[in-house]
């Protein structure tokens, strides 16, 4: 006898359910594997992004520190420490005809100035305001002991006049500080005499960039002329002089009257 067997519906359903479970488990495993990989990639990307942020912040910190240090150095170079001194001296002008005819006590004329004295730079910057009782011009004057130069900026004409520094009549900055200290304390009698300079503008200076930063700042973009002493000019024609003017200041314990003539 031959037996013929048939799958019952219940067995078919169990087989299909088993296959569904296996497929679900397979998809779950694949999903977990992919999720793990994605998490690792995301973690690596996050770590890489954090590293780049740290490097960027570190670079910005170095740049900021460099800017601060560089700015401080530039400020120190261009804005060095200095003290403004103010003082006044009086002098008797013996060449004034009015004084020679005047009887009694002599008439002393005041010379007032402000001095920006920078001992570290070995320089004195003197500001001579408009005088009240004399015929001299207001001026800005630089005595640069490092460069060995003196520069006069006539504030009425707007021109610069340059000459070698005359150390026989200009005190070094340290001594000038002491002089202004005496004037301020009243320990020095501010009545003195006059030393006269007779100078002539002989040639125009086109470039002042090699004369130091201070003279450059004073005279750049201005007409600048070289000064020579009149007594050193051979064959000098006095008739060629068109105009002369005076600048008075005290770079010492006396007044210096600088007479400048120009064609």
Swiss-Prot record:
Keywords assigned by UniProt, alphabetized: Disulfide bond, Glycoprotein, Membrane, Signal-anchor, Transmembrane, Transmembrane helix
Domain of life: Eukaryota
Membrane spanning residue stretches: 54-74
Subcellular location: Membrane
Main location: membrane
Annotated BRICHOS domain residues: 133-227
Bilayer topology: Single-pass type II membrane protein
Single GO biological process annotation from the record: plasma cell differentiation
PROSITE patterns noted in UniProt: BRICHOS
Any GO MF annotation of the entry: amyloid-beta binding
Matches recorded under Pfam families: BRICHOS
SMART domains, per database record: BRICHOS (SM01039)
Glycosylation sites: 166
GO cellular component, one term: Golgi apparatus
Disulfide cross-links: 160-219
Signal peptide: none
Sequence similarity: Belongs to the ITM2 family.
Protein's name according to its UniProt entry: Integral membrane protein 2A
Species annotation: Homo sapiens
């Amino acid at each position: 006898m031959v037996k013929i067997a048939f799958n019952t519906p219940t067995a078919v359903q169990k087989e299909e359910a088993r296959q569904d479970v296996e497929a679900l488990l397979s998809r779950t495993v694949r999903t977990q594997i992919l999720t793990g990989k994605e998490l690792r990639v995301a973690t690596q990307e996050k770590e890489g992004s954090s590293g780049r942020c740290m490097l960027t912040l570190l670079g910005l910190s170095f740049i900021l520190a460099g800017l601060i240090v560089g700015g401080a150095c530039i400020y120190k170079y261009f804005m060095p420490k200095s003290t403004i001194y103010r003082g006044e001296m009086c002098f008797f002008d013996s060449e004034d005809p009015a004084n020679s005819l005047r009887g009694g006590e002599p008439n002393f004329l005041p010379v007032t100035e402000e001095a920006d004295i920078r001992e570290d730079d070995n320089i004195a910057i003197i500001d001579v305001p408009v005088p009240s009782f004399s015929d001299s011009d207001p001026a800005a004057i630089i005595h640069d002991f490092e460069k060995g130069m003196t520069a006069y900026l006539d504030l009425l004409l707007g021109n610069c006049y340059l000459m070698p520094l005359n150390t026989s009549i200009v005190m070094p900055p340290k001594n000038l500080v002491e002089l202004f200290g005496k004037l301020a304390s009243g320990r020095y009698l501010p009545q003195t005499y006059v030393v006269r300079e007779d100078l002539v503008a002989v040639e125009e200076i086109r470039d002042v960039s090699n004369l130091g930063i201070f003279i450059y700042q004073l005279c750049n973009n201005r007409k600048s002329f070289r000064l020579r002493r009149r007594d050193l000019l051979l064959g000098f024609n006095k008739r060629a002089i068109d105009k002369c003017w005076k600048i008075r200041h005290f770079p010492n314990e006396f007044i210096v009257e600088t007479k400048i003539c120009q064609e």
